[in-house]
Amino acid sequence: MKLNKKHLVAILSVLSLSIIVVPLLTSCTGDIPELNPAEIINTLFPNVWVFIAQVIAMCVVFSLVLWLVWKPTNKMLDKRREYIAKEITDAENAKQEALQYLENAKSEHLAAQAQTLEIIAKAKSESLTLRESLEKEAREAADKIISSAKISIANERRENLERLQSEAREAAYIAAEALMKKELSREDNDKLVDQFIKELENNEK
């Protein structure tokens, strides 16, 4: 704490009173005779010049003490106060920097998290789109295969039917021609029918 003028005046007053009171107390240790006012003044101030010299000496000593002790001490205290204030300021600055760094880290973390979620959502959307496209292509390919198979089966059935009809006409023509050449018995007729049926079955195979 820095001393002001009031503190200095109080210290000087205490020292002055001590110079005055100490001789008085010393003189009062013995038997105290009855003193008149003049003797009391002479006892308190036996010699005015000695008192003045003591006051001057006290002021000189106090000035030396103030010069040799107080100023270096005050200077050291000022440096200490400046050092403490600097440490407090540095601590506050470090705290603010740490808070700012924490805020930046939080912002970067949130941004990275949002970007990650966006990438995941985009990947899911692209995967769903690709799956739907592949399913559509697969359905179209399957429909084409089924349609082609149906057409092929229908063509093959038509060709077989046409071939069977042609063979049946040919067989009927041959049978009619054979019947015209000779008269068949019941047994020969059954044989011709059985032979015609077997030929149809063989042709179907």
From Swiss-Prot:
Q: Which Pfam families does its entry note?
A: ATP-synt_B
> Signal peptide span per the entry?
1-27
What GO molecular-function term can you cite, just one? Answer: proton-transporting ATPase activity, rotational mechanism
Q: How does it assemble?
A: F-type ATPases have 2 components, F(1) - the catalytic core - and F(0) - the membrane proton channel. F(1) has five subunits: alpha(3), beta(3), gamma(1), delta(1), epsilon(1). F(0) has three main subunits: a(1), b(2) and c(10-14). The alpha and beta chains form an alternating ring which encloses part of the gamma chain. F(1) is attached to F(0) by a central stalk formed by the gamma and epsilon chains, while a peripheral stalk is formed by the delta and b chains.
Q: What keyword terms does UniProt attach to this protein?
A: ATP synthesis, Cell membrane, CF(0), Hydrogen ion transport, Ion transport, Lipoprotein, Membrane, Palmitate, Signal, Transmembrane, Transmembrane helix, Transport
Give me the residues lipidated as N-palmitoyl cysteine.
28
From the UniProt record, report the name of the gene that encodes this protein: atpF
Membrane topology reported for the UniProt record: Single-pass membrane protein
Query: Which CDD domains does UniProt cross-reference here?
Result: ATP-synt_Fo_b
| The UniProt record lists the keyword Nucleus | no
According to its UniProt entry, this protein's organism is Ureaplasma parvum serovar 3 (strain ATCC 700970)
Q: This chain belongs to which protein, by name?
A: ATP synthase subunit b
Judging by the UniProt lineage, the source's domain of life is: Bacteria
What residue ranges are annotated as transmembrane? 48-68
